[in-house]
């Protein structure tokens, strides 16, 4: 596995990218993480068969270390169209007119679906893992979204909450476990420890102020009216007991998107990578293989 660290520019933002296995001659897979997760999250959460044998990129959410934001970056800058243009631009700068597969987790899943709404001609397929069409969240991350949604006066409290959690490793691990439903399996998974180690440097270096605009706007996201515009193959993956994105959102997505395939991880939450590792790896690889095979049809 060969990896390069890149930064791609978009409207004053420097969007961090990992570019892997550029020598492999096949369509690239683009991975977009969820909020609070730097791009190296994927190094711990993907199967070796993908990490080593596929050509892939991991593209950051805006404002997430090591990405950089411009002076004057504000919540009012962000909506569904802006996110679409951001990822459309970054992918185009990386891949030109070549079609790609996009895989996203949580807000990354939303971003992948949002790309599919607007850019069918540039995509081979989309996989949404615990993604959503509407920014109606529960759990610990839902509380952060609600807090940020109160406006500028809540920003110091938002930042303080994140600062406290990242300073205390035991607290950070506990809070991450609240994303899972099967916490016993999540906590026992070696992948969990690896993930927390992989993201640690970026988490500690994170400019917490840069996270606020996206969190402030998430509750306003809603692409449901546009889902019928999706014309590419889509796989929806969801935990049956996701505490952040209610599983009903995934059922609605699967019903609203033509020919969408639905994969449900029974008795799992927001982190199927750890909660249902073997099933997740099998389903992810199968979906990617299916999209790759469509090139020759």
PLM regions and their residue ranges:
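Acidic catalytic loop of the alpha/beta-hydrolase fold
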Residues: 241-245
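Flexible "cap/lid" loop of the alpha/beta hydrolase fold
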Residues: 126-165
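Active-site loop/oxyanion-hole signature of alpha/beta-hydrolase fold enzymes
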Residues: 57-103, 282
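Conserved HGGG/HGGXW glycine-rich cap/lid loop of the alpha/beta-hydrolase fold
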Residues: 13-69
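Catalytic active-site module of serine/aspartate enzymes centered on a nucleophile-bearing elbow/loop
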Residues: 260-297
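Conserved hydrolase catalytic core segment
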Residues: 98-141
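Conserved alpha/beta-hydrolase catalytic His-Asp/Glu region
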Residues: 137-139, 162-228
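Short beta-strand/loop motif that positions the catalytic acidic residue
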Residues: 230, 236-238
